[in-house]
Amino acid sequence: MPNLAEHYQLSEQDYLAGEPDSPIKHEYIDGEVYAMAGASANHNLITGNIHGELRTHLKGKPCRPFASDMKVKIGSRYFYPDVLVDCAEYAGDDQFTETPTLIVEVLSKSTRRMDETVKRSSYSQIDSLQEYLLIEQDIVDVELVRRSNGWRSEHFFMGDQFTLESVGLTLSVSEIYDRVKNADVTDWLLQQAAQAEADAAASMTAATHAAATDQP
């Protein structure tokens, strides 16, 4: 996630030359270099959950999933999406891709504005991009925008499922938020536990009633 308070000017050539050896990742936006801030536990869990599902689903297929360390080049801009999938023939460049099919960003208070404005506008200019997935980490809210839907937003919440048409993968929101800790996840887990307890009690009552009915 870019730290907007820590940025400076640099040529595109110098940025590309220095980035591989830098201990801190940087995004590059029209001549300005922005240092990437560290990510929270929830951010890392969500990124890992999404990447894990994609990696399993795409194993043995042409499309390749990447997490966090592969840059996307759009004109004179370079971003590090949290997760991306590239289905184009591998060109051998290990620094960036220009042909992502799917991009995923995990949002936070410090990155939401960038992810929903600058990055959304930039990503929509990528001819190969079919879907952009934005995932909140502090609440449960999954936003999916598709090229085929005119980049209009669809939102999904706990209990919902949706399909990433670009890669043919159906995900549940609960899979995305597995082991994530926020108030929405906690409330949903409590509701699920209460429902399971109620169902078990109802089953026991039904079984007891059936046994009593069967007695002569």
Task: Locate the predicted segments by residue.
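Gly/Pro/Ser/Thr-rich low-complexity, intrinsically disordered segments predominantly at protein N-termini
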Residues: M1-P216
